[in-house]
Amino acid sequence: LREAARRYDIPLADWLDLSTGIAPWPFPLPAIPEQAWTRLPESDDGLEAAACLYYGAERVLPLAGSQAAIQALPRMRRGGRVGVLSPCYAEHAHAWRQAGHLVREIGEAEVEPYLDSLDVLLVVNPNNPTGRVFEPAELLAWHARLQRRGGWLLVDEAFMDCTPQSSLAACSNRPGLIVLRSFGKFFGLAGARLGFALGERPLLQALAEQLG
């Protein structure tokens, strides 16, 4: 946006940025206490408990933005066949390809024919950019078929805050189901670089180790 403002000589304040789905009205911010700058984060500081309560999840893993999990999760599986329901956020397919997986970008009508040949299915719900919302029952049916073979259903719920009734957060303790949530978009606080992975304990522990 700054580059465009410079190129067209239009003040930054006069632009409406439609290139990203971040709310332009940030959540009201209190004064930041000094200890937030001087102390290391702690696992019992209330962040995880607050996130579990908000999302309705049994457990969460805080992330430096959901992008951290998008890049790390493909490294936790051996090379396999990954279906990415497209169109969607391009970093998903890119990350799985970079980790050596065979990635097929599929349309909604192709899920049923291809599902039983996949090791991982990735769904962005609600979809970005189409806005399509998949109902939990349909996603859980896909998850059951994948999980029987040791597969994963990975659901990116970065834009789910407006339609929480469609979230799989409450089911995220099931083996082979991973839900990603973004904090910055809905609350307009992208600079915080905060996201969460929701899943069963062993998987979240493995992800934490992968992230270091």
Identify the residue ranges that each predicted region occupies.
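N-terminal "arm"/small-domain region of PLP-dependent enzymes with the aminotransferase-like
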Residues: 1-50
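Structural scaffold positions in well-ordered secondary structure
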Residues: 18, 156-158, 180, 195
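Short glycine-rich anion-binding loops that position phosphate/pyrophosphate groups of nucleotides
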Residues: 21-27, 66, 125-130, 160, ...
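Phosphate-binding glycine-rich loop
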Residues: 44-82, 88-89, 93-95, 99
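Short, conserved active-site loop motifs that form the nucleotide-linked donor/cofactor pocket
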Residues: 60, 151, 176-177
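Helix C-cap/helix->beta junction micro-motif
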Residues: 99, 148-149, 174
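Active-site phosphate-binding strand-loop segment of PLP-dependent enzymes
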Residues: 104-162
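Conserved core segment of the aminotransferase class I/II
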Residues: 179-212
